[in-house]
């Protein structure tokens, strides 16, 4: 991955639920957005009031859970990702 995230931004590859057994196909606007993904890049963190960087608690490879409408979708090298702040992540697998 040749994409360097800045500040407390996290780049996530969404892990989508597979419901292919249903004969009903919903339009994209009606589908539930993924809320779980794999972290593929993280920024260094944010600066505190003393000018020191607060390190990230999320690292590359973590599987995380996030708010349904968190972040922004981007496309990089013909693949879709979600960029969000670390504070939008609500949990990670242990």
From Swiss-Prot:
GO molecular function: ATP binding; metal ion binding; protein folding chaperone; protein-folding chaperone binding; unfolded protein binding
Keyword Lipid biosynthesis: no
Keyword annotations from UniProtKB, A to Z: Chaperone, Cytoplasm, Stress response
InterPro entries reported for this sequence: Chaperonin_GroES, Chaperonin_GroES_sf, GroES-like_sf
Taxonomy, superkingdom: Bacteria
GO biological process: chaperone cofactor-dependent protein refolding
Location(s), subcellular: Cytoplasm
Pfam family for this entry, one: Cpn10
Protein purpose: Together with the chaperonin GroEL, plays an essential role in assisting protein folding. The GroEL-GroES system forms a nano-cage that allows encapsulation of the non-native substrate proteins and provides a physical environment optimized to promote and accelerate protein folding. GroES binds to the apical surface of the GroEL ring, thereby capping the opening of the GroEL channel.
Quaternary structure annotation from Swiss-Prot or TrEMBL: Heptamer of 7 subunits arranged in a ring. Interacts with the chaperonin GroEL.
Protein family (similarity comment): Belongs to the GroES chaperonin family.
Protein name (Swiss-Prot/TrEMBL): Co-chaperonin GroES
Organism: Ehrlichia chaffeensis
């Amino acid at each position: 991955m040749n994409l360097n995230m800045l500040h407390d931004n996290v780049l996530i590859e969404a892990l989508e639920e597979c419901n292919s057994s249903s004969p009903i196909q919903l339009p994209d606007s009606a589908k539930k957005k993924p809320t779980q993904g794999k972290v593929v890049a993280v920024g260094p963190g944010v600066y505190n009031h003393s000018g020191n960087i607060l390190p990230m608690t999320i690292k590359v490879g973590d599987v995380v859970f996030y708010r349904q409408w968190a972040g922004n979708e981007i496309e990089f090298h013909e693949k879709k990702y979600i960029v969000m702040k670390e504070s939008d992540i609500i949990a990670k697998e242990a």
